Amino acid sequence: LNTNVNLSAPVGVLCFLGACFVMAVLGLVALHALVVRRFGRARVTLVLLAGVLAVYFGLILVFSLASGERVLARGEEKHFCEIDCHLAYSVADVRRAKTIGDGAGAATARGEFYVVTVKTRFDETTISPRRGNGQLYPNPRSLTVFDDKGMTYPVSEEGQRALADAGSAGTPLDTPLRPGESYTTELVFDLPPDAGDPVLLINESDLPTHFIIGHENSPLHKKTEFKL
């Protein structure tokens, strides 16, 4: 299973919440000690706080260095493990075009448009029988294309607008799903002619994910990307 973590997601989230709680308590104890002028207690508490920070960020570094980069082929899925690994993403198709749309609503690429069809699927095998058939709302996603020179390319606003005007943008990525459901989304990127070996990175855009042990958004963690 290709995922966006290399530590069990519930463990990573619990470690994050636990570390935040411990650091908050130690911070309050240190603040109180300073207010009542118990400087010895404040010093010890701050040393403990620094120790917790060092251990936590040390664990982030260990799991990041143990991670590996993966480039997925057409149709291979990447599961997003936010707590449970319910949502799976894959690249279903890629087509190239110089122009998207017709008439006044058309958009012309500076280089070449890559129109990427991304499939989102709620993997029903990842749920328990007790979960039911309720909808799942995807968290915000960040989508970026990288080439072999390390250059980055965001979604083209002009190309995306032209695709939407033509009625070909598909289903928005934040559309909720029920178990077993799937949909496709068309995303446009404007790449220069010399962009070699482009890959698409789909990841979470929430800030706290950068501080979760084993999450691909954490510092130095390798990524799981899609070949275009």
Where are these regions (language model features)?
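Short linear motifs in intrinsically disordered
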Residues: 64-71, 132-136
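A short beta-strand signature
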Residues: 109-125, 139-142
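Short, solvent-exposed beta-strand/turn "edge" segments of beta-rich domains on protein surfaces
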Residues: 97-115, 128-134, 174-178
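Low-complexity, acidic Ser/Thr/Pro/Gly-rich terminal tails and inter-domain linkers that flank the onset
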Residues: 69-110
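Generic short beta-strand segments
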Residues: 92-98, 119-125, 203-207
